[in-house]
A protein has these predicted regions:
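N-terminal helicase ATP-binding lobe
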Residues: 1-404
Length: 404
């Protein structure tokens, strides 16, 4: 079954922003205004994948630090931290700003302690003092605000207070995949911050997700905390526009019945290797991504393809067990074999996608990796789904339908 997904276009402001000197999407300006509004404590940006939620979050951190303080950005995976660090560097250079950012996870913290020869507490104080932006994960964020790093020395709350005095602009990216414990910790940190904030130095929280979970919003509303939900303005199927920017290109989506009990993606790859070869022959500048549900399946596929003389394209690997060196090397390969590590936020310049999915959420998230970058003659997605999913699609859409 084949479906054509029409391109998506995001509405832009009519005028160039006088501060950033670039044209912003409607939702980006709304986020900036909301963060600067003293009557709004918490903002949810639910703009679509590819519509610049990262830039929407960075602009207040770049230009409003005098009032907001420093920026603390929390991401659900370390892979996403690394990817977003590139975005910070890209935008700070493009906007000609000197921004000191720091990646903070268990590995970088250990390396910093080893290199500087100081204690963990002093290391965290140094990072807080030196960095304009800190990119971390929700677990490190929780350990800081729950006094974990300063349990046995003097005022156990001192380090947490230091961080929350400096970092009064807190961003949670892809928060819909936070587990229940992480959601609880986020709510706890919001309560802690509000209890310690003053009217002169308020704390602002920004949540980013194209597929938001309502749990956090409902909990905040029940607590009587003011929130603002911001959405993008979109049109579909345009050929050209002076008022909108194309954020997702037309995609040819093919739904293929593929049962895990029959070998799943591994069998499909073996049976359709020549089809993939032909795609790369027809479109030699193409870059592709294959996302499977299992790390072990991914590694078996990588090994199988590299040992198969019939495979005429180069292979890369990006899983939770893949070293940074191999991940970096994979960026130059024609087809990257990946897992859920790349589900959220990670930006690939690809025009060919094959993927399994666990549920409707991962179906949309993985499909959202495709069509984000111009310059390719075609954008092709093959979704490997159970029989009943394909049947449900067939009940709703005719073969070769066009949908937005």
């Amino acid at each position: 079954m084949k479906i054509k997904l029409l391109s998506t276009w995001s509405e832009l402001l009519k005028e160039t922003d006088p501060i950033a000197k670039i044209k912003l999407a409607i939702h980006q300006k709304k986020v900036w205004d909301a963060v600067c509004n003293p009557g709004i404590e918490i903002i949810f940006d639910t703009a679509l994948t590819g519509d610049g939620k990262t830039l929407a979050a960075l602009l207040p951190a770049f230009y409003e630090s005098q009032n907001l303080g420093k920026g603390l950005f929390a991401y659900p995976t370390n892979e996403l931290i690394r990817d977003q660090a590139k975005q910070v560097e890209k935008w700070s250079q493009y906007l000609n700003l000197a921004i000191e950012s720091h990646q903070l996870n268990s590995q970088t913290l250990a390396e910093f302690i080893k290199n500087e020869g100081i204690s963990k507490i002093e290391t965290l104080r140094t990072i807080a003092n030196d960095a304009d932006l800190v990119l971390t994960n929700p677990d490190i964020f929780t350990l800081i605000h729950r006094f974990f790093y300063n349990q046995y020395r003097g005022n156990i709350a001192h380090l947490s207070q230091t961080w929350f005095i400096y970092f009064r602009y807190v961003v949670f990216d892809e928060f819909h995949i936070f587990n229940s414990a992480q959601v609880t910790n986020v709510l706890d940190s919001i309560a802690f911050s509000r209890a310690n904030a003053t009217q002169k130095y308020p704390v602002k929280f920004l949540f980013l997700s194209a597929t938001p979970d309502k749990l956090i919003q409902e909990a905040l509303e029940k607590a009587g905390i003011s929130i603002k939900v911001i959405k993008g303005n979109y049109q579909h199927g345009l050929k050209d526009s002076k008022t909108h920017r194309c954020i997702l290109r037309d995609v040819e989506l093919e739904l293929v019945a593929c049962q895990q009990t029959s070998g799943g993606a591994e069998n499909w790859i073996n049976d359709n290797l020549e089809t993939i070869n032909q795609f790369f022959r027809d479109y030699p500048t193409s870059k592709g991504l294959l996302i499977v549900n299992s790390v072990f399946a991914a590694k078996r596929i990588v090994k199988s393809l590299k040992n198969n003389y019939s495979c005429k394209f180069t292979i890369g690997e990006n899983t939770g067990l893949t070293s940074l060196e191999i991940r970096k090397d994979s960026e130059s390969k024609q087809l990257i074999i990946a897992t859920s590590t790349v589900d959220v936020g990670v930006d690939f310049e690809i025009n060919f996608l094959v993927y399994e999915s666990l549920d409707s959420g991962t179906f949309i998230q993985r499909l959202g990796r495709l069509g984000r970058h111009e310059g390719f003659p075609i954008y092709k997605a093959i979704a490997l789904v159970p029989d009943w999913v394909k049947e449900k699609f067939a009940e709703i859409y005719a073969n070769n339908s066009e949908i937005d």
